Amino acid sequence: MNNKLTQHPDNAMLVEFSAGTLPTAASICVSAHLHFCQKCRAELLRLDQVGSQLMTEAEPADVDDSLFDSVMAKIEKAEAAPPENIDQKSDNGFPFSVNRLLNNPAHRPIWKRMSGSVDVARFKTGQTDYEVALHRICAGGKTPKHDHQGTEYTLSLIHI
């Protein structure tokens, strides 16, 4: 797999990723990028440390007593649920976040032909403003004519 990176997430995006507030679709792209980029992993670690320090120094907030019971109920419910059986040991060279999409038995990708050289699989994120779509493009293939409305993040994973 070719891992020459030409673009990187900006610091604002890495801060949101670190805080867990980045939308799912963008998080998948950032996670996949981090798989290949030592520079961005180092910056994320630094941001995580800053966030940790801020949390340590923050004044404790008053919380309703029922919140603890609610959190514990969610934890117990999650423990009772069977673990997802996702093949994490795939040796295809793809990042974990991409393998998680490709190998989830509950949501196997449905590939649809876009053109003679492009197939696409779309995934629901639960967010109406974002979409995750994986494209398989044959060597030498060209993407169909399309527009770029809104914000788009593209991560190209190239097998050579």
Describe the residue ranges of each PLM region:
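A short, N-terminal "cap"/entry segment at the start of jelly-roll beta-barrel domains
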Residues: E79-Q127
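Conserved small/polar residues in nucleotide/adenosyl-binding loops
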Residues: H159-I160
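Iron-sulfur (Fe-S) cluster-binding segments and ferredoxin-like electron-carrier domains
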Residues: L44-S52
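Conserved short histidine dyad/triad with adjacent acidic residue
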Residues: A133-H148
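A short, acidic loop/turn at secondary-structure junctions
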Residues: G51-A73, A81-I86
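Short, amphipathic alpha-helical interaction patch
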Residues: M1-R41, Q53-E57
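Conserved hydrophobic/aromatic beta-strand scaffold that supports enzyme active sites
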Residues: V120-R122, V132-R136, Y153
